[in-house]
């Protein structure tokens, strides 16, 4: 079995960690090294943040319809590659492949489609009148790039 070299995906391109370091990725079911993953550091995080922040300029101006369509395209692409995603997840976690398509990959597809639908369900509420002859309202706007580290390979 050949050992794959994994890379970070930043600004639409696959790139190695700036340090050049990698770490073995081991299949827990058989103990074999099947990939090398980049050991990313502060410089890699900064590069990813800057790329995401630049993309945010366009994304934040997208209409609800455009955002919805983008999420639907992501869901469709994931669904089209469900078998491949299940193979990758099984190899990475040791989970039985037989359950991964239905209970993880397709559940993820469903969640993305749910939020795609929510993208067009805009909610605005009028608030109390704080000044005579003025109407106040609540407006939700994108705030920018965030980071998240999740445990146990979820969600």
Regions inferred by a protein language model and the residue ranges of each:
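Short glycine- and Lys/Arg-enriched binding-loop motifs that mark or flank ligand-binding interfaces
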Residues: 8, 16, 90, 113, ...
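Glycine-rich loop-to-alpha-helix module at the N-terminal edge of alpha/beta enzyme cores
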Residues: 32-122
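Conserved small-residue-rich beta-alpha loop and adjacent elements
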Residues: 125-155
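Glycine-centered flexibility sites
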Residues: 12, 20, 31, 94, ...
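Hydrophobic face of amphipathic alpha-helices that form TPR/SEL1-like repeat modules
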Residues: 1-29
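Residues at the start of alpha-helices and the adjacent loop-to-helix junctions
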Residues: 4, 8, 23, 40, ...
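Basic, gly/Ser/Thr/Pro-rich low-complexity segments located predominantly at protein N termini
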Residues: 17, 25, 99, 122, ...
């Amino acid at each position: 079995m050949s050992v794959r070299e994994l890379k970070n995906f930043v600004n639409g391109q696959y790139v190695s960690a700036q340090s050049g370091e990698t770490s073995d990725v081991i299949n827990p079911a058989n103990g074999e090294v099947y990939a090398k993953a980049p050991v990313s550091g502060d410089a890699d995080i900064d590069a990813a943040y800057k790329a995401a922040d630049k993309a945010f300029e366009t994304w934040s101006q997208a209409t609800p319809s455009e955002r919805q369509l983008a999420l639907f395209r992501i869901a469709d692409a994931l669904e089209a590659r469900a078998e491949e995603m299940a193979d990758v997840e099984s190899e990475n976690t040791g989970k039985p492949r037989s359950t991964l398509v239905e209970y993880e990959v397709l559940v993820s597809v469903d969640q993305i489609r749910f939020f795609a639908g929510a993208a067009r369900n805009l909610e605005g509420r009028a608030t109390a009148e704080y000044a005579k002859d003025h109407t106040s309202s609540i407006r939700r706007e994108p705030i920018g790039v965030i980071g998240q580290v999740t445990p146990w390979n979820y969600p």
